[in-house]
A protein has these predicted regions:
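Glycan-recognition and catalytic cores of secretory/periplasmic carbohydrate-active enzymes
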Residues: 1-244
């Protein structure tokens, strides 16, 4: 999970820059981001002595690592240094997994997300967030089509009545149907709700299609607000055993 964690360090800095009014601090943050990214590129990628990004994680085919795409695109936008965009392009070329090309599957709609080799919902959504950012810079309509198809397929097969996904832990599992089956297990992760709302927000900003806003509203008022703990409840680890 090293690359996954590094992604959020970089995103945290990147989004903070947008609201930071201290110009000296902003320059310092950009320098830190560049050092962070340069170190990653020295160790990860194609070439002798480097590790393929999909092999930097032992789970989910490396989808979690590939989701670092988004901050590399944003760093390119901050610096105009093409090496960061090139690294982003390398990540896209992997298809976001060592043994299944998510990009091509969504571009051509050959399978639904719950039918993919790896079905971890949050991480998969994060990869397509990055792909949308990459599209905004590159302009290749195939990338936008793949993101739109991904979202449409999630809405068709893995979007529940309350506006979340995954009735098997944190995995896509055709939950549009599976939600009708009784279960007292862990399901419909709030991280999935929030990440999908983020992706829908970005897709609306790019396309202007108001249908994405409708789904944001559904997820927000139901899955997200319903998950807020306003009664100071405690929980036994991740087993879902809740008491006051």
């Amino acid at each position: 999970w090293d690359m996954w964690a590094r992604k959020y360090v970089m995103l945290g800095f990147t989004y903070y820059i947008e609201i930071c009014k201290n110009q000296a601090l902003k320059r310092k943050i950009v320098r830190a981001l560049k050092r962070h990214a340069d170190y990653i590129m020295k160790k990860v990628g194609k070439g002798r002595g480097k590790t393929d990004v999909c092999l930097t994680s032992g789970v989910y085919g490396g989808m979690n690592s590939c989701s670092i795409l988004e901050p590399f695109v944003k760093l390119y936008e901050l610096t105009d240094d093409k090496k960061y965009l090139d690294f982003a392009g390398y990540i896209v070329s992997t298809g976001f997994s060592k043994d299944f090309n998510l990009y091509e599957a969504c571009l051509n709609k050959t399978a639904y997300p719950y039918q993919f080799k790896h079905t971890k919902a949050y991480e998969m959504m994060s990869c397509f967030e990055g792909l949308l950012e990459y599209y905004k810079v590159i302009g290749d309509e195939n990338y936008l089509t793949a993101v739109k198809n991904f979202v449409d397929m999630v809405l068709e097969t893995d979007y529940t009545l309350i506006g979340c996904s995954g009735c098997t832990h944190e995995l896509f599992d055709n939950s549009s149907v599976k939600q009708t089956e009784y279960s007292d297990g862990v399901m419909q992760e709030t991280c999935v709700t929030v990440t999908f709302m983020k992706l829908l927000t970005k897709l609306y900003a790019v396309t202007g299609d108001s249908k994405y806003i409708d789904y944001i509203e559904k997820s927000g008022y139901n899955a997200l607000f319903g998950a807020v703990n306003n009664e100071k409840q405690t929980m036994k680890r991740t087993l879902g055993i809740v008491w006051k």
